[in-house]
């Protein structure tokens, strides 16, 4: 025997159960002779061992855990050469001869469990992202995982991991959340029905977060509740505010009844907040994180806007029935927080190449060099990174979500400087694109607010990988978008995919603060920060706008600075928060903020 050396998140059930301390009869029914059969057989044995000795399985020995049900989450195989979706299948087993589970529960109950969960999944997917999602039906078959557990059991085959049309959805974090919530709702409804009680579904995360100073040593945090259009019971009743000071951990939270929270602060300390919504059904996922700091010797206050909301699957393409796939080198997508499922780049794009062997899997085949690695995604915590650099430069800062700004809940004109975080924000579709594309860098409402802010003398710093490509090369070009970039922010698009080196060097300009700054940003997949595969090449537009940075390998413009009579702008074609070292982030932020305050030096 030899250990794999792989992380435990890749571990099969058989070895996880052994490591967790379960007896050999549970994790290895074959007594060590067959890992493959042990892996699928041990799951049902594990369920029975957990429940053994409890009220639901009193005649067996075990850990006395009164389980309500067992649920096995699978994906299936199967391909189509077009946009057809394989879809979802439910499997249960009502038994041959034995019509009840351990405590005389009818085995027919498993059919009801399967039906309610499968119905919830299909209904929610069809209502949101894919009206043609295929509900394949329900099978009453003697699969080991369905037959052996002595409690109501369902096997779900959610989609085909082998089919491109299915995986366009399956790789998207938004779809994963929707399906996971649907499964949770289906199980909740089943348990409530079995026990004859009313249920309530946990709320969705709150949005519209914003912070403000209401005194020298006090701040106010506000947000909005989010109703669930798919579930009327998921209404928030209260909220929990979690606080982090500096780079410490978040506290255990403060329960509040309203959609606002005030707190005393200590100057020169960075405070960060995230909020969850709660009701009798449970607690929502956390909101994005907003941060702030009151500097005791402040030069001014910067408003940081988090406009990086995107989570999505990798870029994908299809050429009729001939070729299709995911182009992770162009855009890996954006995982929610992190991803552990990516194994490597796809290399076989020909639809007609069949599966021959697991080592020659045909269409969709991918490399295996990332099987053991964790890939960083969107942490929704970037105001903190920007804020550290801002406070290092001597400025206080507040932060807000972009929706709070576009809904005019934040008065930008109260702040001399704005820092807009765009990260890898860009317009993307989900699946085959039935619904409108999401995550536009500069929606019309934001353009209007930024234009008004600039015309009233504001200074704005914007950084993001698609600050220009999303306006010029998105498949649906809008001349108004381009005019906004040209005439308000004073930059123009040169090219997407401008660099692969991850290195930026200074360019000759009238702004001496940038003359010696070299920057290196994350351009490959890693566990610390999301990667920028395709930064933007941008150029200055109009009088007073100059290139201040270029990409290291080709001299394509990476950043511009505009000094006008009424306002200033600084635009970067790569995200500021992806810069690898805090020293480089501090130096660049200081150069930007100080240049906003200085008179232009003519060459």
List where the protein language model places each region:
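Beta-strand-rich modules
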Residues: 262-283
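Helical hinge/lid and interdomain linker segments adjacent to catalytic or ligand-binding clefts
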Residues: 343-479
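Active-site-adjacent mobile loop/cap segments within catalytic or ligand-binding domains
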Residues: 54, 69-99, 128-196, 573-578
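Short beta-strand segments within Ig-like beta-sandwich modules, predominantly Fibronectin type-III
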Residues: 251-258
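A glycine-rich, often tryptophan-bearing local segment used as a flexible ligand/cofactor-contacting loop or short
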Residues: 424-532, 545, 552, 588
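Pro/Thr/Ser/Gly-rich low-complexity, intrinsically disordered linker/stalk tracts
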Residues: 190-233, 281-300
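Short, surface-exposed beta-strand/loop micro-motifs that present aromatic residues
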Residues: 142-147, 535-538, 548, 552-568
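Catalytic-core regions of hydrolytic enzymes
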Residues: 1-86
